[in-house]
């Protein structure tokens, strides 16, 4: 094994983890200012060292394991969650991909649906009724919203004519897909909120009824891994939204592409935080009704429109 095979993944993983650490600080600061308070401001200048202090505190704590839990699955679940969250980043161009996959988008969907297993295992291995209910909620919610994500993705890929990220940037050279497919963009964005278990869809962490959800028995290091995975998923989903609908620019200028991509992703991520501060939590039946009775019929109709549009204007997408 050469040194480059170790350095390559590390140069990808370490910046993601640093971004995740400071996203937690940004969230706490934004929520603080929206609630007319300061947020973290003691550790370091303006509280900038808070995520480092939090991370150190969590990882040096003694790992506590309740007596009746399943020890292997209990440790395996957070590790799997973080591994899946990191794997999603491999086909994403920044501006070059870590693995140039032909079916980049399909692999991202497959990996994100595999990440559900870690939540299910965590709830089951904890041997707690609250954790199990939380994990079952998370699984039902994630699997449900993946249906609309898949159909929206299919609609966009029909316009593009291929599964690679590079084709998408070429398709959006003259006009963003946001301008032509804004209903899909709105439904995609709301579905990503549900997919990442964020407010107002954070039913898995319903504090009033489930204490903390599927991670109720976790503390210290394993809890930190779940936390990192959740925020890494938020950033990766927003990156995807940016590539799909708000073209990050041509890949001929790597520096401009990266700056453009990061700026737009930051705006989308701040919107996630703004939504968390503004909206109350959905009821579970409202969450399911929104998907199965509103989003699904609408996305299927729009998918048919995207298919028929190409034929009706006598133009086929660039087939690769």
Swiss-Prot record:
Disulfides per UniProt: none
Entry annotated with the keyword Translocase: yes
Membrane topology (UniProt): Multi-pass membrane protein
Keyword terms: Electron transport, Membrane, Mitochondrion, Mitochondrion inner membrane, NAD, Respiratory chain, Translocase, Transmembrane, Transmembrane helix, Transport, Ubiquinone
Highest taxon above the source species: Eukaryota
GO molecular function: NADH dehydrogenase (ubiquinone) activity
GO BP terms: aerobic respiration
Catalytic activity, as annotated: a ubiquinone + NADH + 5 H(+)(in) = a ubiquinol + NAD(+) + 4 H(+)(out)
A GO CC annotation given for this chain: mitochondrial inner membrane
Annotated EC: 7.1.1.2
Transmembrane stretches, start-end: 3-23, 72-92, 103-123, 147-167, 174-194, 226-246, 255-275, 295-315
Subcellular location field: Mitochondrion inner membrane
Similarity section: Belongs to the complex I subunit 1 family.
PANTHER family: NADH DEHYDROGENASE SUBUNIT 1, NADH-UBIQUINONE OXIDOREDUCTASE CHAIN 1
Main function: Core subunit of the mitochondrial membrane respiratory chain NADH dehydrogenase (Complex I) that is believed to belong to the minimal assembly required for catalysis. Complex I functions in the transfer of electrons from NADH to the respiratory chain. The immediate electron acceptor for the enzyme is believed to be ubiquinone.
Protein name per its UniProtKB record: NADH-ubiquinone oxidoreductase chain 1
Taxonomic source organism: Varanus jobiensis (Peach throat monitor)
Species lineage: Eukaryota, Metazoa, Chordata, Craniata, Vertebrata
């Amino acid at each position: 094994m050469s040194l480059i095979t170790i350095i390559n993944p590390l140069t990808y993983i370490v910046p993601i983890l640093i971004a995740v650490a400071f996203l937690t600080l940004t969230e706490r600061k934004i929520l603080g200012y929206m609630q007319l308070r300061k947020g973290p401001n003691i550790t370091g200048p303006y509280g900038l060292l808070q995520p480092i202090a939090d991370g150190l505190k969590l990882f040096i704590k003694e790992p506590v394991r309740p007596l009746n839990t399943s020890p292997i699955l209990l440790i395996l679940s957070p590790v799997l969650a973080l591994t899946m969250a990191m794997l999603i980043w491999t086909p994403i161009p920044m501006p070059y991909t870590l693995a140039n996959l032909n079916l980049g988008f399909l692999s991202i969907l497959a990996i994100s649906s595999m990440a559900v297993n870690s939540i299910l295992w965590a709830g089951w291995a904890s041997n707690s009724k609250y954790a199990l209910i939380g994990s079952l909620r998370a699984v039902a919610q994630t699997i449900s919203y993946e249906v609309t994500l898949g159909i929206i993705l299919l609609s966009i890929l029909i316009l593009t004519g291929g599964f690679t990220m590079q084709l998408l940037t070429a398709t959006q050279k003259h006009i963003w897909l946001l301008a032509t497919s804004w209903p899909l963009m709105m439904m995609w964005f709301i579905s990503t909120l549900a997919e990442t278990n964020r407010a107002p869809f954070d039913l898995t962490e319903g504090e009033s009824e489930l204490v903390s959800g599927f991670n109720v028995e976790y503390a210290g290091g394993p809890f930190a891994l779940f936390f990192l995975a959740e925020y890494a998923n938020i950033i990766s989903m927003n990156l995807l939204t940016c590539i799909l609908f708000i073209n990050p620019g041509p890949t001929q200028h790597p520096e401009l592409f990266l700056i453009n991509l990061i700026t737009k992703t930051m705006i989308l991520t701040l919107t996630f935080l703004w939504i968390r501060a503004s909206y109350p939590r959905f009821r579970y039946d409202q969450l399911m009704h929104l998907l199965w009775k509103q989003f699904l019929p609408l996305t299927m109709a729009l998918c048919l429109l995207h298919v028929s549009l190409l034929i009706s204007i006598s133009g086929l997408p660039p087939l690769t």
